[in-house]
């Protein structure tokens, strides 16, 4: 409590926030610290936070301080030292806070300072062994409560070794124990211990070690004086020798085996063996426990003391104990012991070293150990006297050595493979050499896998350094081992390796050793080295640099670098395939570099691949740049075309003496660097039979050709060989050489052939006539055939050249065909299609257009000698045996095929016929494609049958085999699968009627298939539902369409889809076509009865949904007119019918079709009489009923005449006013309808009696013919009896009843529902059938009968009282219904409205009454509501059956009819007139700039006006409170007037752009000169004279002023003529305004203060001011009409003042001004001595009057200077100007008289006169100033129109007030109203 009271409350609040806050991630190392109280030393404790940087503080620094650890520059630290600071011995606490400077998190630790009450020494053991590690002893301090202090750091202790009085015979010596310092040990102490040891002090922790065996006692006490009474702490330690027993573990022996034990001790870090038996120690066997089956009398084992050997005698166990021989030591220390188990051998085990894995490697040495285990898997000690026989296969192992007992073998693995080693424990040999064979030998074997050593390939890899990790990967191959390896890298910064041996380079250079360890034996591994170095050079390795076009060249790269370590050894990189090599080709298009790089190879590390694209040569440059390393290499490449024999391709045949020019193409080109190495060789077998010669160099650079001319000199065959290439060179070490061979044959012709030249030589077909009639060929009789002569040798090979032959031609019938001499045979070499040219002899045969047969023959008679001589043919040669050929020609017409184009369906069963006519009759038919169609020709019929195979287009070509020249006759066949189906059907069908659906199947070209294919397609038309039925019709619209009849059987919507089966059996369906089966389209009403001028709207029911537009028409347009919306208006008496048609558009044809139609009869009549429709004629007082006017028939309802134009008026009256009240139908909501709407009224029964109800119907325009006989009025009257309601007078109570209609129900409710237990019961006699029924919940249900029942309601109160009421329940039929409306409308002055407000939503409630007028509480009527038109109101169902909601949407009259569906006699009619509730009525268009004072009489119940709003404030802004609206922009807007929670009405306003803006000068009577300085111009925006619309209230006028409508316009000024050098705005100012009284905008123009220069200029020239106004600049097309404002700048004088004297008695002054001002200019003088008279008048331009000013009395001024003024004023313009006049009297020195000398000479000669004149001028000026301030200043006007022009202070003498008051104002009688304009006050020049 004491320390808590010291903490500030604010701090506690902070702590509380931090403690209860969310846990932070940072933590302190300790929550509480207990520190000892000290005086001499300070005990520290380090606090440390896990993370963050903190500001540390202590709540009580005097108890415990806190010091942060770290740099002094930082304001925070993560560690801090807590130090006990308490000066008085007490237990106190300080709270340590650490606040994170970043997050604000606060950590807390409590630091407690207390006294030490006791200490104790803590150790890990109390026994020390000689030469063992030292023991650490630590002091632990406790307070009075036994709490342990957190630290004793820094507290000084005294550690001493004292005498041990309890040694019990042990040697007690200070030398037995030694206290060590940490400085001389190998252990790290706490930092404060090191500091204390340096100061030769001992802390709370020390080290001790044993010096010799014995016992020692250690004592520690606190050195601090405060704790002198604290009891020291003591500890006794025992120091022993370190004795070991070998083996020290438990031993398992077999019977008969033995083990030798050794006793050892550790001395100076070495283990030495003690000779046993010893003086100090002895071995003993104790606790011998034989096996249960053993002999208890025999020992389990015996110990031979001399040899320390234990021999197992029988199965069991025994303990071997090492003990002290000295009795005093036997209980003081614990010596080692061992347990010996004698067991039976269970099985053998095998181990191998190294690795302990039975996976070995050949060539390695291994130690195999065979171990014996008992049945419990305990390892048996392998005694030397056991015998184990091991079998190690000699082909796998080389045994180097073995142990005597056979348990150890040193071997070498010599062969790989799988084998097994086995071992058998057979016997035990005793000490005497006796062999004891085991009855059951123990045998086992071990499988061994031996592998060859692991080697990695390659052994060295060298990679270039790349900046990114993983640039190179290489899969290292490992051989040997088990095949399953684990991989490792010695330096992962250089290279890494994956589990699959994939090496990846890292980011550093250097060496990494990759090892692959055998997973089955990790000791086996193979390794290789990976170097990562920087490259230093790059070059291409020798390779092939020539390639055929299309082939690829691989260009290997060799990149070298220096080995790591700084040496000069260069090594070739193993892999540089990931180098970012830049490959550049000098000549683009020859070689194309291929993506990717060559994989590394033995002689290269990477490389590029290029593809030969075109023949030519280029240079390839490969470069690499990274950082400071830049390498490049260049190589020249060449591409060539393959060498091939073109002509001939293989064999050339010529006749003797003929030659053949052989053409070869391609082959290597001359090497670009050494062209001289290029060669071409051509050889033959026998150079004497043929001559060969190369024709010129290669033809061109781009297309290399080799031509060899071969000439036949002797008959025979030869092989010609050509080889092309380059010889090896330095830049082309592996050149390409291309060889090729052809055969040459020189032979005589064995036969000749004659063939017609056909237009299609690709058809290798012969005419059948040629085979049947031997060389009979039909040809066209209209074209000359061309015959081709060919020569063949004995092998049937055609001659390449037979030009050395001599040929003779003949014709058998020259009249049909002849050989003309002027058309000799042309020898032409033509390509035979294989590139080889053959000689053709082309001979033209002339035909003469006659049919018949002729024979043409050609004969080779011998050789031409000229050819033989030129070819140097060897002589003699064999003569030629003549050969000949003939051909018979038949002249015929050309072939034709029909049809030429058609489309067929792809189906196996489809076939079409092509008709072939004319021609030779021998035809070959083929197609342009092989897989589209199959064509079969029936020659007997001349018909080709076409079968489809696959979709597509193909051309059938009919070749006439026996006509040589004509092109084939063609027919284009399109084979198509089904692309889509198209269903055309009207989407609407009336139930019970039918429409036709048309289906077409389209091919791929969107063309329809023929209908004959539909049978192959299984065409079906299906409907998605059963609302329609489908019938297939046989009639066909065309050859492509299937027709179906769609019959509507049920109402709904479905879809039609056609489907067919294609060739593959898949169904193909069309897009579903929606079709609607709609109910019969019916127009309502079925008959329309109207009078002339009345209107009724025809509506519809049924028909398609959503309903399309209905087209209305009438058959007799003179009787009535019908609008597009179905509104029928009566025109004249008569009958007609209105047809309503529902149309739809045919999707395919686009034609409009009629879906459904209906007729309505229309009767236009005259009202012959009227009747009052009253549901009852007897009514009870206090009830009401509706009455309305009808015609004489039931069809003549108010719908027939209620809205006629011109209208009818209805006037109601009663004969006795006190019996009935007549009220309008909407009287309850304060609407009083005018007479023209009062066709229906409400009748209220007031008092009992009988009265007549009369109505008079008057025609507003009798000539309209609405009443029979052009009558003016009709009337009717009925009698109504009002009777009094039955009441009880004694007692005077109200007897009420529940009124229900038959078959209705009501839920009864009482005021005790939920509070009392209610029960309901109908009290009727047992003989009377109940009229109503009720249940326990209060549901009252009436039956079909009528009558009265009694209902008992009992309430059982919880306090024990019962309440009972009896209620009569009357069941009666409904007699009539009545409509009422809500809500009630309130107006400002309680006046009634004449119509419903536009935009209002009202609720109509239907009330049901019985025959007495009482209202039913429950009924079962189903009501219908209808209006005579739907464009003025919107009607909708209400929340209950007897309500409807109507919203008024447009101005006009609508009639509402409500009736009971089951009882048509229950009906009512009410008028619904709708008018605007917002005024004013806007006759014309509203334009931008108009201001509207909107108003509405509607208010809330309390008389509060509503709020105004606009749908678009940027178009029309409306003040929400007053309703003032300003049109700002063109557009349509809706203004809303809303009374919150009651109603909302609106008015639609269209704001247009004004066509013109007119400014007019405002003529006003100005009464003062000051007002003449301003002028106002009215601005009319638009065509109206006023821009203020509506009647504005005072509040609205204030709102207009606050809204500043003048901001909408801007006013502009300019001079009408540009006659001044300054603009009008420098002289005048103009401001826009708005005058609410005028309702117009204004431009107020004011003249500024003018400078003398401006005043002078304005007077010198005359013009007027043009004022225009404009609205925002977006309306650029607005016409602007300006106003012309005349202005007068004011009077101007050419002198500022006048000086007169007795010498100069007169002076002239010119006064300038407007003509209006100068015409009646008056002048007045302030002194009689000074006069002014007109000298000259000039009313030209400029206008001025010259005045002569003189002194009347020459002696004036003799008594002193006379100062006065002349005032020039104009009554017409109220302008005036004042000129000061000074008269001085000057004496003449030279003469006695005053008139002797001139004024000037006296002035110049008299010094006094100069001073006099100066002071006179000063006096005059002073008088003027005083007069100004005295007279003018108080008279300044403040009217806004009197904006006086400003002037600078030096012009002040020229203001109006500068003249005396007497001249300042004209007499009122003389003041004339100046013309409206701008007038300046008086100005004068200086």
Curated annotation (Swiss-Prot):
This is Nuclear pore membrane glycoprotein 210. It is found in: Nucleus, Nuclear pore complex; Nucleus membrane; Endoplasmic reticulum membrane. It comes from Mus musculus. Keywords: Endoplasmic reticulum, Glycoprotein, Membrane, mRNA transport, Nuclear pore complex, Nucleus, Phosphoprotein, Protein transport, Signal, Translocation, Transmembrane, Transmembrane helix, Transport. PANTHER family: NUCLEAR PORE MEMBRANE GLYCOPROTEIN 210, NUCLEAR PORE MEMBRANE GLYCOPROTEIN GP210-RELATED. The lineage of its organism: Eukaryota, Metazoa, Chordata, Craniata, Vertebrata. Its main location: nucleus. Residues 1078-1151 form the BIG2 domain. One of its GO terms (biological process) is nucleocytoplasmic transport. Belongs to the NUP210 family. The chain crosses the membrane at residues 1809-1829. The modification Phosphoserine is found at residues 1839, 1873, 1876, 1880, 1885.
């Amino acid at each position: 409590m004491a320390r808590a009271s010291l903490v500030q409350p604010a701090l506690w609040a902070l702590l509380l926030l931090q403690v209860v806050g969310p846990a932070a991630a940072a933590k302190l190392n300790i929550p509480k610290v207990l520190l000892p109280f000290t005086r001499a030393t300070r005990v520290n404790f380090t606090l440390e936070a896990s993370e963050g940087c903190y500001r540390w503080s202590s709540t009580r620094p005097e108890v415990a301080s806190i010091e942060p650890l770290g740099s002094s520059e930082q304001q925070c630290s993560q560690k801090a030292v807590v130090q006990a600071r308490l000066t008085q011995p007490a237990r106190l606490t300080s709270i340590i806070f650490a606040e994170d400077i970043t997050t604000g998190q606060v950590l807390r630790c409590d630091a407690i300072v207390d006294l030490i009450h006791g200490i104790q020494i803590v150790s890990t053991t109390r026994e020390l062994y000689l030469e063992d590690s030292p023991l650490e002893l630590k002091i632990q301090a406790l307070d009075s409560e036994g709490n342990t202090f957190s630290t004793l750091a820094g507290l000084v202790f005294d550690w001493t070794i004292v005498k041990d009085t309890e040694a019990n015979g042990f040697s007690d010596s200070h030398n037995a124990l030694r206290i060590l310092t940490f400085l001389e040990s190998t252990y790290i102490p706490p930092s404060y211990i090191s500091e204390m040891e340096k100061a030769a002090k001992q802390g709370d922790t020390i080290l001790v070690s044993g010096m010799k065996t014995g016992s020692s006692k250690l004592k520690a006490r606190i050195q601090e004086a405060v704790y002198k009474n604290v009891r020291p702490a003591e500890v006794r330690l025992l120091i022993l020798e370190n004795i070991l027993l070998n083996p020290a573990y438990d031993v398992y022996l077999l019977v008969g085996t033995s083990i030798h034990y050794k006793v050892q001790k550790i001395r100076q870090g070495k283990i030495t063996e003690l000779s046993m038996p010893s003086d100090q120690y002895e071995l003993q066997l104790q606790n011998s426990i034989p096996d249960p089956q053993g002999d208890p009398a025999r020992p389990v084992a015996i110990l031979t003391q001399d040899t320390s050997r234990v021999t197992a005698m029988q199965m069991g166990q025994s303990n071997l104990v090492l003990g002290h021989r000295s009795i005093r030591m036997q209980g003081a220390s614990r010596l080692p012991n061992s347990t010996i188990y004698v067991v039976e051998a269970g099985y053998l085990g095998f181990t191998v070293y190294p690795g302990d894995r039975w996976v070995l490697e050949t060539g390695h040495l291994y130690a195999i150990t065979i171990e014996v285990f008992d049945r419990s898997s305990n390892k048996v000690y392998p005694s030397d006297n056991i015998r184990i026989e091991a079998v190690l296969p000699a082909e796998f192992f080389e045994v180097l050595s073995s142990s005597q007992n056979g348990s150890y073998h040193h071997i070498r693995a010599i062969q790989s493979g799988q084998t097994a080693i086995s071992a058998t424990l057979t016997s035990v040999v005793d000490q005497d050499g006796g062999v004891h064979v085991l009855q059951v030998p123990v045998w086992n074997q071990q499988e061994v896998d031996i592998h060859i050593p692991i080697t990695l390939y390659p052994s060295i890899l060298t990679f270039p350094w790349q900046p990114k990790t993983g640039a190179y990967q290489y899969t290292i191959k490992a051989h040997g081992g088990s095949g399953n390896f684990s991989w490792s890298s010695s330096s992962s910064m250089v290279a890494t390796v994956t589990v699959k041996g994939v090496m990846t380079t890292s980011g550093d250079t250097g060496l990494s050793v990759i090892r692959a360890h055998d997973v089955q034996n990790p000791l086996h591994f193979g390794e290789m080295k990976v170097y990562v170095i920087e490259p230093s050079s790059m070059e291409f390795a020798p390779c092939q640099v020539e390639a055929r076009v299309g082939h690829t060249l691989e260009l290997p790269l060799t990149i070298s670098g220096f080995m790591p370590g700084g040496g000069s050894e260069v090594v070739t990189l193993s892999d540089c395939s990931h180098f970012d090599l830049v490959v550049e080709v000098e000549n683009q298009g020859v070689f194309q570099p291929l993506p990717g790089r060559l994989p590394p190879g033995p002689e290269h590390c990477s490389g590029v691949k290029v593809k030969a694209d075109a023949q030519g040569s280029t240079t390839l440059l490969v470069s690499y740049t990274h950082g400071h390393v830049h390498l490049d290499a260049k190589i020249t490449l060449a591409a060539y075309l393959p060498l091939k024999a073109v002509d001939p391709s293989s064999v050339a045949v010529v006749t003797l003496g003929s030659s053949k020019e052989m053409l070869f193409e391609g082959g290597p080109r001359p090497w670009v660097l050494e062209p001289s190495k290029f060669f071409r060789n051509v050889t033959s077998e026998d150079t004497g039979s043929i001559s060969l010669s190369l024709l010129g160099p290669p033809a061109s650079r781009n297309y290399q050709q080799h031509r060899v001319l071969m000439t036949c000199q002797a008959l025979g065959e030869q092989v010609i060989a050509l080889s092309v290439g380059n010889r090896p060179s330095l830049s082309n070490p592996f050149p390409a050489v291309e060889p090729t061979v052809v055969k040459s044959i020189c032979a005589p012709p064995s036969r000749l052939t004659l063939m017609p030249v056909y237009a299609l030589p690709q058809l290798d077909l012969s005419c059948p006539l040629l085979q049947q009639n031997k060389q009979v060929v039909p040809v066209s009789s209209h074209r000359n055939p061309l015959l081709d002569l060919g020569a063949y040798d004995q092998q049937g090979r055609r001659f390449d050249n037979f030009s050395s032959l001599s040929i003779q031609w003949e014709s058998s019938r020259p009249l049909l065909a002849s050989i003309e001499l002027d058309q000799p045979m042309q020898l032409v070499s033509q390509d035979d299609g294989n590139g080889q040219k053959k000689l053709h002899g082309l001979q033209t045969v002339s035909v003469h257009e006659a049919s018949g047969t002729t024979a043409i023959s050609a004969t080779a008679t011998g050789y031409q000698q000229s050819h033989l001589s030129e070819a140097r043919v060897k002589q003699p040669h064999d003569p030629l045996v003549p050969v000949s050929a003939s051909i018979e020609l038949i002249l015929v017409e050309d072939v034709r095929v029909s049809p030429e184009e058609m489309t067929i369906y792809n189906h196996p069963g489809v076939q079409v016929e092509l008709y072939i006519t004319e021609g030779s009759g021998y035809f070959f038919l083929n197609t342009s494609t092989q897989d589209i169609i199959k064509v079969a020709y029936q020659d007997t019929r001349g018909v080709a049958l076409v079968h489809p195979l696959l979709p597509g287009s193909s051309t059938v070509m009919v070749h006439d085999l026996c006509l040589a020249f004509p092109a084939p006759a063609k027919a284009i066949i399109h084979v198509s699968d089904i692309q889509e189906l198209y269903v055309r059907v009207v989407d609407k069908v009336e139930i019970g009627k039918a429409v036709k659906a048309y289906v077409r199947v389209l091919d791929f070209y969107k063309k329809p298939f023929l209908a004959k294919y539909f049978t192959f397609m299984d065409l079906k038309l299906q409907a998605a539902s059963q609302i329609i039925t489908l019938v297939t019709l046989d009639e066909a619209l065309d050859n492509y369409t299937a027709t179906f009849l769609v019959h509507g059987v049920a109402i709904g919507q479905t879809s039609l889809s056609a489907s067919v089966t294609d060739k593959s059996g898949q169904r193909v369906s069309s897009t579903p076509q929606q079709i609607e089966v709609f109910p019969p389209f019916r127009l309502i009403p079925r008959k329309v009865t109207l009078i002339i001028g009345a209107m009724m709207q025809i509506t519809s029911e049924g028909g398609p949904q959503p309903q399309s537009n209905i087209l209305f028409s009438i058959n007799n347009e003179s009787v009535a007119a019908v609008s597009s919306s179905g509104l029928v208006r009566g025109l004249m008496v008569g009958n007609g019918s209105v047809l309503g048609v529902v149309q739809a558009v045919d999707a395919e044809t686009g034609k409009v079709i009629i879906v459904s139609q209906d007729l309505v009869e229309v009767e236009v009549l005259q009202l012959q009489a009227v009747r009052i429709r009253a549901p009852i004629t007897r009514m009870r007082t206090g009830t009401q009923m509706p009455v309305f006017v009808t015609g004489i028939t039931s069809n003549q309802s108010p719908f027939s005449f209620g809205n006629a134009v011109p209208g009818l008026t209805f006037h109601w009256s009663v004969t006795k006013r006190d019996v009935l009240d007549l009220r309008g139908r909407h009287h309850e909501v304060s609407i009083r309808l005018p007479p023209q709407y009062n066709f229906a009224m409400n009748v209220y029964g007031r008092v009992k009696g009988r009265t007549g109800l009369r109505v008079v119907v008057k025609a507003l325009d009798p000539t309209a013919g609405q009443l029979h006989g052009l009558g003016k009025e009709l009337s009717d009257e009925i009698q109504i009896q009002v009777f009094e309601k039955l009441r009880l007078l004694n007692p005077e109570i109200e007897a009420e009843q529940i009124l229900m209609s038959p078959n209705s129900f009501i839920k009864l409710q009482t005021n005790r529902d939920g509070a009392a237990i209610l029960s309901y019961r109908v009290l009727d006699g047992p003989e009377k059938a109940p009229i109503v029924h009720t249940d326990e919940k209060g549901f009252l249900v009436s039956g079909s009968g009528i009558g009265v029942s009694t209902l008992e309601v009992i309430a059982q109160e919880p306090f024990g009282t019962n309440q009972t009421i009896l209620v009569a329940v009357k069941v009666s039929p409904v007699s009539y219904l009545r409509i009422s409306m809500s809500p009630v409308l309130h107006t400002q002055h309680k006046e009634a409205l004449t119509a419903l407000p536009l935009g209002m939503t009202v609720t109509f409630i239907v009330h049901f009454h019985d025959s007495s007028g009482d209202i039913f509480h429950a009924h079962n009527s189903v009501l219908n509501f209808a209006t005579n038109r739907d464009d003025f109101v919107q009607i909708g169902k209400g929340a209950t059956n007897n309500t409807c909601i109507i919203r008024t949407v447009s101005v006009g009259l609508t009639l509402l009819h409500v009736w009971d569906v089951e009882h048509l006699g229950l009906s009512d009619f009410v008028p619904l007139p709708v008018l605007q509730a917002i005024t004013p009525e806007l006759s014309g268009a509203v334009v931008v700039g108009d201001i509207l004072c909107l108003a509405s009489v509607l208010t809330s119940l309390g008389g509060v006006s509503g709020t105004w709003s606009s749908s678009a404030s940027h178009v029309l802004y409306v003040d929400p409170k007053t309703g003032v609206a300003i049109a700002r922009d063109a557009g349509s807007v809706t203004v809303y007037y809303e009374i919150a929670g009651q109603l909302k009405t609106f008015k639609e306003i269209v704001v247009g752009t004004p066509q013109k803006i007119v400014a007019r000068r405002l003529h006003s009577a100005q009464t003062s000169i000051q007002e003449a300085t301003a002028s106002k111009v009215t601005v009319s925006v638009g065509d109206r004279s006023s821009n203020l619309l509506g009647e504005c209230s005072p509040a609205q006028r204030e709102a207009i002023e606050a809204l500043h409508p003048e901001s909408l316009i801007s006013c502009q000024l300019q001079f009408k003529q540009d006659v001044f050098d300054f603009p009008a705005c420098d002289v005048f100012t103009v401001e826009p305004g708005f005058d609410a009284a005028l309702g117009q905008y204004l431009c107020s123009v004011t003249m500024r203060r003018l400078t003398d220069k401006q005043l002078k200029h304005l007077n010198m020239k005359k013009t007027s001011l043009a004022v225009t106004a404009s609205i925002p600049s977006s309306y650029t097309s607005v016409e602007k009409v300006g106003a012309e404002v005349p202005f007068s700048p004011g009077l101007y004088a050419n002198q500022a003042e006048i000086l007169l004297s007795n010498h100069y008695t007169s002076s002239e002054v010119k006064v300038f001004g407007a003509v209006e001002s100068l015409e009646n200019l008056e002048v007045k003088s302030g002194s009689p001595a000074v006069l002014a008279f007109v000298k000259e008048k000039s009313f030209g331009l400029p206008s001025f009057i010259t005045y002569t000013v003189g002194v009347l009395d020459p002696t004036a001024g003799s008594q002193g200077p006379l100062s006065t003024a002349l005032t020039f004023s104009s009554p017409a313009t109220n302008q005036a100007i004042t000129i000061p006049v000074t008269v001085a009297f000057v004496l003449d020195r030279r003469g006695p008289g005053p008139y002797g000398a001139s004024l000037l000479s006296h002035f110049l000669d008299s010094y006094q006169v100069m001073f006099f004149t100066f002071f006179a001028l000063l006096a005059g000026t002073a008088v003027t100033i005083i007069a100004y301030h005295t007279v003018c200043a108080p008279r300044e006007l403040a009217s806004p129109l009197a904006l006086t022009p400003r002037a600078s202070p030096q012009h002040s003498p020229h203001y109006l007030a500068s003249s005396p008051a007497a001249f300042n104002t004209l007499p009122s009688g003389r003041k004339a109203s100046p013309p409206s304009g701008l007038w300046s006050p008086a100005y004068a020049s200086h």
